[in-house]
Amino acid sequence: MNYLKCLKGSSNPDDFVQSWKYKRAFRSEHPEYFDPDGIMVFCGPQGAGKTLSAVQYVIKLAQNYPHMILVSNVAIDDDVLGGVKRYPYTGLQDLSKYNNGYAGVVFLIDEIQIEFNSLESKNIDPVVITEIAQQRKQRKHIVGTSQVFNRIAKPFREQFKYAVMCRNICGFLQINSLVKGEDCMVDEQGNVKTNKVKRFYWFHTPRIYRAYDTYAKIIRTNTVGYGGGKR
């Protein structure tokens, strides 16, 4: 027997129709279903608008998915979250601590390289990577910011779904370039090289400025290392 034939699946057109009906019925039964997953990191130097862009993105997610919960080290005003439950991010253990079924969990981690430092990449607990790799099944979405792409540990970067390169002009015109993580190559200076880019242009607003504390200091939340030892 040629066991490779076991790789073949159905070629019955009726199965296509039944699969479509199944998925439509599933979404009807679960209107709270959270579509985003994987890791999206906003990158750029200080003043590039990366935190502003990440906060706006999360606020829009909250508007579209009101049943999600948010775990963050950025103090976003509850008024702009529309009633979405918000919890403070306290460390890597939160990635497995918070679950919300089909309704989803968003982790917004400003300066994410503080947690996933490339200089400590050899000490990353495999359990953490396993948790990250299973985000899609658990409807979890990690949104982070980082000044330099390659300061984030490589095992973590390899799990990226998207990276967003941020810059702004005159302090109010935002230009963000979206690239797929699988298409990214990083040079020695930490610059992301890719041919597949989608750009977004938008203006800053006073509302988004007031939505969070732009001058808050991000501290290292974990004092325990990835392998259980002290950092």
Where in this protein do the model-derived segments appear?
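Conserved nucleotide-sensing/catalytic segment adjacent to the nucleotide-binding pocket
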Residues: 79-138
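N-terminal pre-Walker A segment at the start of P-loop NTPase domains
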Residues: 1-32
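Conserved P-loop NTPase motor module
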Residues: 182-231
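P-loop (Walker A) phosphate-binding loop of NTP-binding proteins
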Residues: 45
